[in-house]
Amino acid sequence: MSEHVYNLLKNHHSVRKFKKEPISEAHIKQLVEAGQNASTSSYLQAYSIIGINDPEIKEELKEVSGQPYVVENGYLFVFVMDYYRHSIINEESKHDMQTSFESAEGLLVGTIDATLVAQNIAATAEDMGYGMVYLGSLRNDVERVREILELPKHTFPLFGMALGIPEDDENGSPKPRLPFEHVFHANKYDSDKDSQRETLKAYDQTVSDYYSSRTNGERTESWSNQVANFMSAKQRLDMLEQLNKSGFIKK
């Protein structure tokens, strides 16, 4: 096993402070090509990548996201579920393909395809010495993002990725993940609630200790509390409507 690859993946953490130095076109091409070689369901390649270095477009997307690093980075990617090219094939084909890419299964396939591509790009970027952070916040206003990026029907902006050279004072670190035993199930799912609660209790303490050590005791939030606060907030409740408008979840 390559210790380099293992350690690279284990040491991943989100970077939100970047130097102003742009990423070269040669590196962007390498990143995209590495992404393209991710696995793709049934060879559909149901994704596109929008690369953004235009400051005005970044500013417009920042208004949607609310995050400064949408502008302050070396480069910005937006990952798009894309069946537009498939719809063009459908227009010229004797087969009726539309049900497939307008179905819930089509949504899952396109989302998974785009995510695998993005993770290949993320790992490659980190191997090049760049830092990165995902931007789910672009879904705060899907309609506006579609307008800014001029996305046609049968496409959907899933998330973004800001990347670049980390600032010298960037001091992020990997957050503790759930224990191996809690996420890995041998042969069958272990749904024993007592066991799950016991593991979560220990993990909550680990996360609380992590935050405390990072903030000199100012933050001691547990993982369970963080999850409860986030998932009880009513956010992006228009997502099904936006998917329908884009031509998805019709079946």
Swiss-Prot record:
SUPFAM superfamilies: FMN-dependent nitroreductase-like. Its cofactor is FMN. Keywords: Flavoprotein, FMN, NADP, Oxidoreductase. It is an enzyme of class 1 (oxidoreductase). Its EC number is 1.6.-.-. It comes from the Bacteria. Belongs to the flavin oxidoreductase frp family. Reduces FMN, organic nitro compounds and disulfide DTNB. Involved in maintenance of the cellular redox state and the disulfide stress response. NCBIfam families: PRK10765.1 (NF008033). This is NADPH-dependent oxidoreductase. The lineage of its organism: Bacteria, Bacillati, Bacillota, Bacilli, Bacillales. The gene is nfrA.
